[in-house]
């Protein structure tokens, strides 16, 4: 199981939100590239980036910070937030992003996801963010009637590289991930599922890993707060 350290970008800073509320952001580092380098130096195999402003704006906003991170690191990086057309997808992949994460557009324009996955094999993931089993979009600001498993199954044969499943109510709350819901989703689809939201301890990582069906986990606040030591966590998962 791969551990993805998270860098959420807001106004050029590395921040964490509490339960997806932009008004409840804690700035952890004003130099995201330095933060990314620190994660790389600790031994991570991947980085997970989110352009929070971009998720709300519907287009990239923190591009300069993302490019600084790419210049400062060599590990593969996945990026989500405000990526809603082929030009943006191609632009980021050309600039060195290893995998783009499509969230809102997966609900609103699923054909674009299929088109992108065909054009860029292995480089397109779907981000499914949910409250109580229903998908939320536009930076979690809008809730839909779409069920998580239905959305995942819609891309079963599309060539999507991964599904990043975030339980919004767990995100940034340090209360542990929704292991059962994440495992249920992983069992419902053949697409690799990455857990996000609430991953805050070695016990959480162990619980996710022992399901045997979850391919990765994303952690942010716990790494910044020191509740989870990245080197120790990577060693535990090795």
Swiss-Prot record:
Enzyme class: isomerase
Pathway: Amino-acid biosynthesis; L-histidine biosynthesis; L-histidine from 5-phospho-alpha-D-ribose 1-diphosphate: step 4/9
The keyword Isomerase is assigned to this record: yes
Entry's EC annotation: 5.3.1.16
Any GO molecular function: 1-(5-phosphoribosyl)-5-[(5-phosphoribosylamino)methylideneamino]imidazole-4-carboxamide isomerase activity
InterPro entries: Aldolase_TIM (IPR013785), His_biosynth (IPR006062), HisA_bact_arch (IPR006063), Isoase_HisA-like (IPR044524), Isoase_HisA-like_bact (IPR023016), RibuloseP-bd_barrel (IPR011060)
Gene Ontology terms describing biological process: L-histidine biosynthetic process; L-tryptophan biosynthetic process
Disulphide bridges: none
Reactions mediated catalytically: 1-(5-phospho-beta-D-ribosyl)-5-[(5-phospho-beta-D-ribosylamino)methylideneamino]imidazole-4-carboxamide = 5-[(5-phospho-1-deoxy-D-ribulos-1-ylimino)methylamino]-1-(5-phospho-beta-D-ribosyl)imidazole-4-carboxamide
Principal place of residence: cytoplasm
CDD domains: HisA
Subcellular location as annotated: Cytoplasm
GO cellular component, one term: cytoplasm
Isomerase as UniProt keyword: yes
Similarity comment: family membership: Belongs to the HisA/HisF family.
PANTHER family: 1-(5-PHOSPHORIBOSYL)-5-[(5-PHOSPHORIBOSYLAMINO)METHYLIDENEAMINO] IMIDAZOLE-4-CARBOXAMIDE ISOMERASE (PTHR43090:SF2)
Record's protein name: 1-(5-phosphoribosyl)-5-[(5-phosphoribosylamino)methylideneamino] imidazole-4-carboxamide isomerase
Taxonomy of the source species: Bacteria, Pseudomonadati, Pseudomonadota, Alphaproteobacteria, Rhodobacterales
């Amino acid at each position: 199981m791969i551990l993805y350290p998270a860098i959420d970008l807001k106004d050029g800073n590395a921040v964490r939100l509490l339960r997806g509320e932009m008004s409840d952001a804690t700035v952890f580092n004003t130099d995201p590239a330095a933060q990314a380098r620190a994660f790389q130096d600790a031994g991570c195999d991947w980085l997970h980036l989110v352009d929070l402003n971009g998720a709300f704006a519907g287009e990239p906003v923190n591009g300069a910070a993302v490019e600084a991170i790419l210049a400062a690191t060599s590990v593969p990086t996945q990026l989500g937030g405000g990526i809603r057309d082929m030009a943006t997808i191609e632009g980021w992949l050309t600039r060195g992003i290893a995998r783009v994460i499509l969230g809102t557009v997966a609900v609103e324009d699923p054909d674009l996801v299929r088109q992108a996955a065909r054009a860029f094999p292995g480089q397109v993931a779907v981000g499914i963010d949910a409250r109580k089993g229903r998908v939320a979009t536009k930076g979690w600001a809008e809730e839909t009637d779409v069920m998580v498993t239905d959305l995942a199954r819609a891309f079963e044969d599309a060539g999507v590289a991964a599904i990043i499943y975030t339980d919004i109510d767990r995100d940034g709350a340090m209360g542990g991930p929704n292991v059962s819901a994440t495992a249920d989703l992983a069992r419902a689809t053949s697409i690799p599922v990455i857990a996000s939201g609430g991953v805050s301890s070695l016990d959480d990582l162990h619980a996710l890993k022992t399901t045997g069906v979850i391919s990765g986990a994303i952690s942010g606040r716990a790494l910044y707060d020191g509740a989870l030591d990245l080197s120790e966590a990577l060693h535990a998962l090795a």
